[in-house]
Regions:
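Sec-dependent signal peptide recognition
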Residues: 1-8
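Bacterial Sec-dependent signal peptides at the C-terminal "C-region" and cleavage site
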Residues: 8-17
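Divalent metal-binding segments
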Residues: 16-22, 27, 31-292, 306, ...
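Short, conserved secondary-structure segments in the cores of folded domains
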Residues: 17, 37, 531-534, 563
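Non-cysteine beta-strand/loop elements that form the S-adenosyl-L-methionine
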Residues: 83, 302-320, 422-433, 491
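Acidic (Asp/Glu)-rich catalytic clusters
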Residues: 267-271, 294-303, 395-397, 418-422
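His/Asp/Glu-enriched, well-ordered alpha-helical/loop segment
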Residues: 362-372, 379-402, 406, 412-416, ...
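Short peripheral tails and domain-boundary helices/loops at the edges of structured domains
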Residues: 562-576
Length: 576
């Protein structure tokens, strides 16, 4: 009896919390207990969700107490689609998407130059993207030709980059810029002829101005620019982790390759990884993954594996997304199919009527690996729904949680096909805010009704999961900030509030639904809903405290809400 009493008493002591949040408006995203006032955390798990009064028994002299002063507490955000390595380059490097004048061009380059280690190349840039969007649709060659694009000169930056090579590109990758240091390293001088398939713009004296065009420019410099060092890549990754903490992102699904996974494992081993990673391989790597025993659920709560990715069409920005009917602005253009869509050829030279995608998908699915496929246009999304039918016939109906990546434009008749198909609509709502400016010009009003159709997807039975697609494309920046995605899903307006009622307002989601899509549904998408995604006793202690209550403020103000505190794995990692 004495032993039992001591054991019971020890159990009570063990339940004292390391961290308690009280006086909060806790929105749990847990239907069994949607609201609370307080949360208690021990180690890295939530041990209590309930009232201010009841949480007191979890507090002792060692408990870190956070008084939320009525602020909104949510589960940490889970971004369903991030290109982490590319985001590193944007967050720490040169972003010129909105630059098309000399002063900001110089200022941005100077800022990066002062932050970078001596001798490291400055690359990227993508200048004049917003200039193109604001002037006209870049999908129409005739109109695009009228734009007087900004053309930088090496003399703008040579004075402070004498020992720093710079090689950057315009957003359309048809014009490049190099400073004097980079030109010298490349052997492009006044006295040398232009390299093959490269046009070097020169002044009246024959000196290179810094502007390069031609089909071989990128390849030529790729052979010169050294790969980023391990130390540089670690530094960049740590910078993005801080960026995530600032925005309350505690989990993300990464599209980067194995090199970035090496960085994640290194940071994890050093106890510096402050975001849970769901990392995807490529579809054609399924067999190697299977041989290594990798399948759905492989890994741990910090780095999760078991998903592969593929692409079947292009993007809206350059009119390569695949549609059943031609683009409205170009009657000869239907978009493209990626090579993976071509019929599979067996080793004996025979031809299988399945696409290579379908052949590989059946194999990977049979091996217990989750599939995720990029599809933008209605024909691309329609094909994947057809493929899902055949996948069910071939491998049987199961809880495969097929990730339909982007699902940007869906035909009206295809929405009903999502029901009972175990499909994750892996969408990025900020795309809507960005693309609505020109979508109807590209595909017309009727087809646009099925674009970024969050409500129709939700009501169809698909599990709608949200993310950012950070860092974006060569024509647009997609920030990691979840508030912009939530704003887009709830208002369907541009950041300056247009149109007044929202673009196709029937497709809006409620604030509660949008929060669920950015938390619990993204956890469900990676088979992790039992360990994270809601503020539930027993789940991982990843939490955010916001400056304003998303459930009470005018939806137009959501984009301006800030994260006050981010808690990851039971530890405060960001405080405003």
């Amino acid at each position: 009896m004495k032993f039992r009493f001591i054991f019971f008493f020890s159990f009570l002591i063990a339940e004292k919390a390391d961290l308690v949040i009280q006086n909060a408006y806790v929105w749990t995203v847990d239907l069994s207990k949607p609201k609370a006032e307080a949360v208690a955390v021990r180690n890295n798990k939530i041990i209590f969700v309930g009232s201010n009064k009841a949480v007191q028994k979890y507090i002792d002299g060692n408990t870190n107490i956070i008084d939320a002063h009525g602020k909104l507490v949510l589960p940490g955000f889970n971004d369903n689609h991030v290109h982490f390595e590319s985001t590193c380059r944007i967050v720490t490097g040169l972003n010129l998407l909105d630059v098309h004048q000399e002063k900001p061009f110089i200022s941005r380059i100077r800022d990066v130059h002062e932050r970078f280690t001596p001798g490291v190349w400055i690359t990227g840039g993508l200048w004049s993207a917003y200039q193109a969007w604001e002037s006209s649709s870049i999908g129409e060659e005739g109109r695009k030709a009228k734009i007087n694009f900004f053309k930088p000169q090496r003399k703008m930056v040579d004075s402070f980059t004498a020992e720093r090579p710079i090689f950057i590109q315009r957003f359309d990758r048809k014009m490049f810029f190099a400073n004097s240091k980079a030109l010298a390293i490349a052997g492009i001088t006044k006295d040398r002829a232009d390299p093959p398939n490269i046009h070097v713009e020169r002044d009246k004296k024959g000196n290179p101005t810094g502007i390069l065009t031609g089909s071989s420019v990128q390849k030529y410099f790729n052979n010169i620019i050294p790969p980023r060092s391990w130390e540089q890549r670690v530094w960049e990754s740590e910078a993005v982790l801080k960026h995530c903490a600032r925005f309350g992102v505690t989990s993300l699904s990464d599209m980067s390759d194995a090199r970035q996974r090496e960085i994640f494992y290194y940071l994890h081993n050093e106890n510096k990884l402050t975001v849970r990673i769901h990392s995807r391989g490529y579809l054609d790597q399924w067999e190697k993954m299977s041989e290594l025993g990798i399948k759905i659920g492989s890994g741990d709560s910090m780095i999760r594996l078991g998903t592969v990715k593929a692409w079947i069409d292009g993007i809206m920005g350059n009119s390569t997304a695949r549609f059943y009917k031609a683009y409205s602005h170009n009657s000869d253009e239907f978009g493209i199919w990626r090579k993976i869509m071509f019929p599979w050829r067996s080793q004996d030279g025979g031809r299988d009527l399945q696409s290579n995608l379908e052949y590989l998908a059946i194999k990977a699915d049979s091996a217990g690996i989750q599939l995720s496929v990029h599809a933008i246009g209605d024909a691309a999304n329609g094909y994947l729904l057809d493929m899902m039918d055949r996948l069910n016939e071939h491998n049987g109906v199961k809880n495969r949680r097929f990730r339909l990546v982007h699902a940007q434009v869906i035909r009206p008749d295809d929405f009903k096909r999502f029901n009972n198909m175990s499909i994750i609509a892996e969408v990025q709502p900020y795309h809507c805010t960005d693309d609505m400016r020109w979508m109807e010009e590209r595909i017309g009003h009727e087809r646009s009704k099925g674009a970024y159709a969050f409500r129709s997807l939700w009501d169809s039975g698909a599990v709608v999961s949200f993310g950012s697609d950070s860092p974006g494309t060569n024509a647009s920046r997609y920030p990691l900030n979840p508030m912009l995605g939530l704003y887009a899903a709830v208002t369907r307006q541009t950041l300056d509030g247009k149109p007044a009622d929202g673009w196709f307002p029937d497709e809006k989601l409620s604030v509660e639904e949008a929060i669920q899509a950015y938390t619990l549904n993204s956890a469900y998408a990676s088979f992790e809903e039992n360990i994270k995604g809601s503020i539930t006793e027993g789940k991982l202690a990843d939490l955010v405290i916001l400056s304003d209550n998303l459930l009470e403020i005018d939806p137009s103000k959501i984009k301006d809400v800030e994260v006050k505190t981010t808690i990851f794995n039971g530890t405060v990692i960001y405080q405003q």
